[in-house]
Amino acid sequence: MSANNNMESEIKEIESISFGMMSSEDIRQMSSFEVKTAKISSTNLLETVHDPKSGPIGSAPCETCHQNEWDCPGHFGHIELNVPIIHPLFINHVVNILKIFCWKCNEFLLTKDHLELNNILKLEKEKKFNAVLEKIKKCDRCVHCTTPRADYKLVLNDITYKTIYRTFSYQGGAVKTARDKKLNESREIVSAEMVKKIFDNIKLEYVEMLGISHPKDFCLEVFPVIPSCCRPHEVQDGNINDDDLTYQLMEIVKNNSMIGAIKLEKESMEKQYPECLKVKEILLLSNVEKQKKEIDDFLKKPIKNGLKTKKKINKEEITPLDQYLKLHDKYVKYVNNLKFRIETYCNNSQGKATHATTGRAIKGLRERLTGKEGQIRNNLLGKRCEMSARTVIGPDPTLKIDEVIVPKEIAQSLTFPDFVNKHNIDRLTKLVNSGNAIRLVKKNESGQEIKINLAAAINNHGTPLQHDDIIKRPKITNNHEEKHNYEEKHNFDTFETIVIKDPKNFVLKEGDILFRNNFQQKVVLPSKKFIKLEEGWIVHRYLQNGDILVLNRQPTLHKASMMALRVKIMDVKTFKFNLACTKPYNADFDGDEMNAHAPQSEESKAELFTLSTPKQCIMSCQSGKPNLTIVQDSLTGAYLMSKENNNDATLTNGEFNDILMVLTQNDEYNGDVVDYFLKRKEDVSNTLKKLGFSGTVLNGKGLLSLLFPNDLYINEEDLKINRGVIYDGCLTKKYLSSTESSLIKILYKEYGVETCATFLNNIQFLTNRWLMISSFSIHAGDCIKQKEVLGTVEQCLMESEKIKMTTQNPFIREQKIMQTLSNAKDVGMKIAKDALKRDNVNLHAQNNFLTTVESGSKGDHLNIAQITSLLGQQITEGQRVKPLLSNGKRTLPHYILKEENNDTEHFHDLLEEYESQGFISSSFAQGLNPKEFFFHCMAGRQGVCDTAMSTATSGYIMRRNVKLTEDIKVAYDGTVQDTRGRRFQMAYGELGYDPSKLVKVNGKPEVCNIARLVNKLNCNFEDNIK
């Protein structure tokens, strides 16, 4: 007990985390074992990568902490490297640090005074270091020893490892001495030993002044070995395979051991042949060209002690000098291999390291931690759950906003635990015995839970049949039910003989006699057992109509990305829901998939029904505008219906009642639905007569008026409603979408959630049914190009030519030309818009392109201009397309190379000149030629790239924000605090208002619009007096 108490008392709260490099001593102190050999035997695993001190192997306890595999956290080991290695992840930092220190005296190239004069020391850590790097570039020599400054570059050699090269150069190219000239022409390799020597001599005061940690730890002398639990072996086809990291560690140990053995052999030769020391000095030269030259000179000189005499070494006739050089080549090879293995152990994102047998790329530490499939996002931040499903989504205009169609396959996979009580015991008993439940849970006398598989408990499959069993069945005339299950059938007295070829699908019947190997067998017919439930048992039943299901589309950015919908089971393959719910999900039906989650308790169902149904998500909690809106077909239908004249009867009485019938299936009205609409129809007719109309309701406006409350008043320029009756204006996106003046918001705020939800359902049912009578489509006649456009293009091009001749400054000239050419698109848009409206008036026909734009259901006037007029100037990187071919004289090879001063006399030549820089005079209806298509793709490509980049950036920011604020909540006292009780706000948003319940009055958020409520009361009072 005392040990446990001591352990508990030592546990403290983490205050901060710091990241940095571990020194060699830190790694040794942390290590529980040293890996010395790559050879593994079944009897001895000590000092290998599978050392028992790294953690338990199988059922054996850990030899370090003596815990089992569940409790042991794992223990690090280490490898003593026989040669220092620059840490591959920090090699760029190493190069930058080398640049600011002298390569000869290892002092800082500048003085502290230099930094103080330029106010560099006052900067933050990273900014300070970058400023020092920029300052060093202007320095030629070390201020301490006057040695020329060296420049360092990182070069990738043989696509496997990186090498640091050192060169000497001077600002302005001035060479001062013979030594300087010699250095200036050299290019040296900087080895890890040289880097370590420089870093070891760097004074601590310089490190503190620069605000960095000491760089000596960037040179690895000891390599850590992660615990075995972090690199578990995997079993495939009965074979045990080592993890990728274990494979890499074994390769590191192999190469390290070979380096150690070669070093010992070289030292032995240096003792035996002292002249080898001279060769060693030459081989250590960092200048490759100088090294080759001195080796050649050394080989030409006469050498004593038999260094050039051939001897039998390792069964090979070779001179000791050649053997020594051969050992050096092997040494360099294994050092490079060691660098490569350590680099790919840390980061193998480019797939350089592969398995020798399979060729599969090895997963390094970086790949395991970072990215979508890494440990952090996939495991630590990942959300995994049972009772969920995923499939493609689609629309269904017959559904209400709070309903979802679920495929039958999914409904028979997801379950809900129902507790048996006196109120539901009969219903659940029927479900269990009809095969609509999967599992039964009850408790025995000792209180232990017993799980019963209902399929096995209810169904008795009878005698198991085998292939070639013989069944004798009483002969039944004209019964071919089992004909497909047997191949041989012979009449035998009053029986028919059946040879079973498909035992799984054959069903025994009463009177069957079974023979197996000429012996009669006992026949037990298939039967079902009746299960009687008791109170307190738990029935895991399949989903049923009316159940709650949470539907989610990723990315989940706000509350309404997960909404609770009521289930309707159908024999389909996709989820289907109402189109009004597409906006909060940001969903479309071009192949999008969504997730469904089945709640597993009555409490969670109640919480979802109270907080997360579409009715509770109608208004956005961020902007206060409607989340659920009328879109596309329904919006077009509402616009066309409200555009009809109040005095015209465009529908027969039968058609009117037929359309009205779709509303009577709605059970959300109080009282008799039919009586409600008959009374409402009479009220609408009376209101129209008072307003000076004929009083007919047999048109679109009359139908729509039935949906509004009888005390709704709207008095806008483009829409007027009196006592819930539309008598002027049209319903457009402004009034049925996500705007401040939306009717959805007004109904939600003034009449409540239920009235608003009923309106959203009914207006979609009504408009969709009306469109079945009054069809709507777009045809080729709506896309005719206007003749006036050609004159506009010519006028804009001529203006551009005038600007080109009169403006001298090239920058100003280009900006004016761009503005003039962009005007062509605006003028084309105006021409298209006016022409379409003019055609509507003259021909008394509706251009359906214009209808979709004016209603707001799809597109805008710019889209119409692009289809019927011209696309205009294409912009890439904020300017016209640059001529990059033929020394900057043309943009594409399709255009003829012309002289710079060549004047264009004809319009065709002028058009081609501007077309070559991205001006498109064609429309989509006319079609783009190949050259125009190139330019159009150039402009579109930039938008695609920007979208992809911004999506990744915003997603990363969102993940960080969610993680940082995941425990912040509004407490019961109204304050905003986290789980530790730290308060961030005394009231949410400083005011404590819910944005979804506010309205904007003159641009300011208010609890309610007093002027509107007063006007409503006055209108009601005046109508009652009349």
Curated annotation (Swiss-Prot):
Pfam families from the UniProt entry: RNA_pol_Rpb1_1, RNA_pol_Rpb1_2, RNA_pol_Rpb1_3, RNA_pol_Rpb1_4, RNA_pol_Rpb1_5
InterPro entries listed in its UniProt record: DNA-dir_RpoC_beta_prime, RNA_pol_asu, RNA_pol_N, RNA_pol_Rpb1_1, RNA_pol_Rpb1_3, RNA_pol_Rpb1_3_sf, RNA_pol_Rpb1_4, RNA_pol_Rpb1_5
GO annotations of cellular component type: DNA-directed RNA polymerase complex
The UniProt record lists the keyword Phosphoprotein: no
GO biological process: DNA-templated transcription
Keywords: DNA-directed RNA polymerase, Magnesium, Metal-binding, Nucleotidyltransferase, Transcription, Transferase, Zinc
Catalytic activities: RNA(n) + a ribonucleoside 5'-triphosphate = RNA(n+1) + diphosphate
Annotated positions binding Zn(2+) 2: C102, C105, C142
Statement: the UniProt record of this protein carries the keyword Nucleotidyltransferase: yes
Span of the signal peptide: none
Binding site for Mg(2+): D588, D590, D592
SUPFAM superfamilies the UniProt entry points to: beta and beta-prime subunits of DNA dependent RNA-polymerase
Residues that hold Zn(2+) 1 according to the record: C62, C65, C72, H75
GO molecular function, one term: DNA binding
Record EC number: 2.7.7.6
Source organism, top-level taxon: Viruses
Its biological purpose: Component of the DNA-dependent RNA polymerase that catalyzes the transcription of DNA into RNA using the four ribonucleoside triphosphates as substrates. Largest and catalytic component of RNA polymerase II which synthesizes mRNA precursors and many functional non-coding RNAs. Forms the polymerase active center together with the second largest subunit.
Family of the protein in this entry: Belongs to the RNA polymerase beta' chain family.
Protein's recorded name: Probable DNA-directed RNA polymerase II subunit RPB1 homolog
Species name: Invertebrate iridescent virus 6
